[in-house]
Amino acid sequence: MADFQDELLALAGIDDSDVASNRKRAHDDLDDVLSSSSDEDNNENVGQDYAEESGGEGNEKSEDEFEEKFKNPYRLEGKFKDEADRAKIMAMTEIERESILFEREEEISKLMERRELAIRLHQQNAQYMAQSTRRSTRDKPLTSAAAGKRDKLTELKKRRQERSARSVSERTRKRSPVSDYEEQNESEKSEEEEGYSPSYAEEKVEQVSKDNASANLYDLNAIRLGRKHVAEYMYHPIFESTVTGCFVRVKIGERDGQGVYRLCQVKGILESRKPYRVDGVLTKVSLECFHGRSKRVFDVNVLSNEPFSDHDFQRWHHQMMEDKLSMPSKNFVQRKLNDLRDMSKYVLSEKEVSDIINRKKELSRVPSNIAAEKTRLRQRRQAAYVAGNAELVKEIDDQLNTLEELSMGSNQNSNSAMDQLAKVNERNRRRNHTEIRLAEQRMNEERRRLSAAATATPMSAPTSVLTGTSPQPSPSLSTSIMSTPKLNPSESVVVASEKASSPDLSPKLLPSESQIFDEGIAVTQTPNTLEDKDFKLHEKAVHGIDDIIATVDFGIDINI
């Protein structure tokens, strides 16, 4: 022990003659240096512990405050306020329900982002205060004596390292290269660890483990793409590279009147065979999606705008475990979230805007005469079919399907107007049918009334107005009138009661005035009194005019 202390004093520049006299003083100096350094370390550790303790208490307190301040207003399933709100939303149509839930999802996402930013800002402030405390402890001004002692100790450490390095170099000549490599790595690791405090190393390990942790339901909803998002950005120049790796909620069918959805990950963008419309936008974009190891291509119009439910996430997680696939990490989710933000903030150049417009025009281009174009394509298809060219037939079929889609989109407004006109025509036809039925009922009632009046009135021969006598009717009256009626558009026999009940329904097949006179039937003028009307009705009933009216074709053209 004495030899080691002498060596230390010799390294410090003290002669051998002064060793005995100055040994006590050297011991005191060395003890002072070690004690001063230990005191500084203790002070630094005390400051660090105090900062960590205060920071930890502050973090717990701040998290509680932030949890209360940024409280999610939709506590029920993360989408509804309460049971009444849930019943109200579920009673809406699917479009209205998805729109409201999409708005609530964005509201919750913004609220969570504000909460995370507030927590991070508070943590950064706490770390800054802790670093300031440690820095103030280290930067405490030293006295000249303490500074000299520290310089001597530094010099001693340097010389010891040089001597140990020489001894190591001598020993390494007899050792293997593998052991040298391991020792070098260990020394490098030890040197690197000396430059970092244990607390920082623990924070670094904790951060790495947190980044490599599996993503949860909240993380996947952060990088979920809805139908509205895809329809808005599907012509964007960096759309394909951005959405690859994101997640979508796909509707695959219905069960018991409810939609069945699957959580899928987008692996690529494909082009569909024919264009289709998504929220009024014409496109040919299709998504290649994976659910576990199952792969399928979906059109954009089957995507849902609602967030993933817990059932969707659990089923997808079970499928990933069953297929022995690794879950995406939180670090991956953060990268995709940054990509989505970059795409939303991307500024398009003039050339990119022109390309987007040209792509939309190319899809929405409609021929001037769609019918003629379809006829021409069908003729080409028939010729290709006869020639046995299956590829050309398939190509022409795709063109015909495209024309059908375009014609449906271009004629949407006109078809709507035609539908309205068809409804008006149908309403008019029903009204005309009702009016005709009522007119027939009135005629039947009038006929029954006239028949009843004819049976109740005594049989008396009418007197002719022209001759004042009662002419005898010819036996062949009914036969001649009913068998060979002649039309006279200017003059006809009109019954006053029928004219009053149905003025628009005038019979066409009535005997002419000359024919009636030739057969000996007296024709009176239009009666002016009620007695004349009754007399004429009685005369018509007696002479069989009812039979004539029953055989008359009114000739009314009504479109039903």
Curated annotation (Swiss-Prot):
GO CC terms: Cdc73/Paf1 complex; nucleus
Compositional bias (Low complexity): 451-480
Location of this chain's protein in the cell: Nucleus, Nucleoplasm
GO molecular function: bubble DNA binding; RNA binding; RNA polymerase II C-terminal domain phosphoserine binding; single-stranded DNA binding
Composition-biased stretches (Basic and acidic residues): 148-171, 440-449
Assembly notes: Component of the PAF1 complex.
The protein's role, per its UniProt record: The PAF1 complex is a multifunctional complex. Involved in transcription initiation via genetic interactions with TATA-binding proteins. Involved in elongation. Also has a role in transcription-coupled histone modification. Important for TATA site selection by TBP. Directly or indirectly regulates the DNA-binding properties of the TATA box-binding protein, and the relative activities of different TATA elements.
Name under which the protein is recorded: RNA polymerase-associated protein C651.09c
